[in-house]
Amino acid sequence: VVSCADILTLAAR
């Protein structure tokens, strides 16, 4: 699954 932290890291790119 995708965690909130993973989404934030991807969005930060």
Curated annotation (Swiss-Prot):
EC number(s) stated in the UniProt entry for this protein: 1.11.1.7
Cofactor note: Binds 1 heme b (iron(II)-protoporphyrin IX) group per subunit. Binds 2 calcium ions per subunit.
Annotated localization: Secreted
The keyword Glycoprotein is assigned to this record: no
Co-factor(s): heme b; Ca(2+)
One GO BP: hydrogen peroxide catabolic process
Keyword set includes Translocase: no
Family of the protein in this entry: Belongs to the peroxidase family. Classical plant (class III) peroxidase subfamily.
Function per UniProt: Removal of H(2)O(2), oxidation of toxic reductants, biosynthesis and degradation of lignin, suberization, auxin catabolism, response to environmental stresses such as wounding, pathogen attack and oxidative stress. These functions might be dependent on each isozyme/isoform in each plant tissue.
Protein name: Peroxidase 8
